[in-house]
Amino acid sequence: AVCQKLEGMYELGVRSFAIFFDDIWGEGAKADKQAGLLNYVTDNFVRKHPDVMPLIMCPTQYNKAWSGGDYLSTLGTRMYPEVRVMWTGNSVVDMIERDDMEWINQQLGRKAFIWLNYPVNDYCQSRMLMGKTYGNGLDINEMVSGFCSNPMEYAEASKVSLYSRADYTWNMPAYDATSSWNQAIAAL
């Protein structure tokens, strides 16, 4: 059923796919079950379409505060190495530094795919997060397999942060939060 749904999206032109296991419990939250499903999808869908990007997954334990046992290492050893694993850092909403990447990459046996929960504001709905984007390590570019931001439900208001996030990922070592924010305001 999963591959059928992905096939329908493929026919519409989608070439990048993600399967999310965040915020679930029970049998579906077990690393071996998740790895098995992702390997199945890779074998029976992704590899049948050479133009499809590697599969991305969000684990149930997507931050260090919620990690425990051998969940992450089980994903890393049982799941195909090309599957990218999302990671939010030490907590749900956090900035990510070099030592954070070293820890998670060792757990997974691969480079993590950063999922920055910013500028999403579902945890502070009375505020719009449009300030400078800062706090992530400027020396982690070689340690990540990808990077995405979780925007607010307000698309236009999210653009300031997303502009800076794109600037950051384009050239991490040279990123300057104040300059990027000023450029975003001028451009948008």
Q: Where are the predicted features?
A:
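Chitinase-like catalytic core of GlcNAc-active glycosidases
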Residues: 1-15
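Catalytic-core regions of glycoside hydrolase
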Residues: 5, 24-178
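Short, conserved phosphate-binding/catalytic loop or strand-edge motifs used
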Residues: 15, 21-23
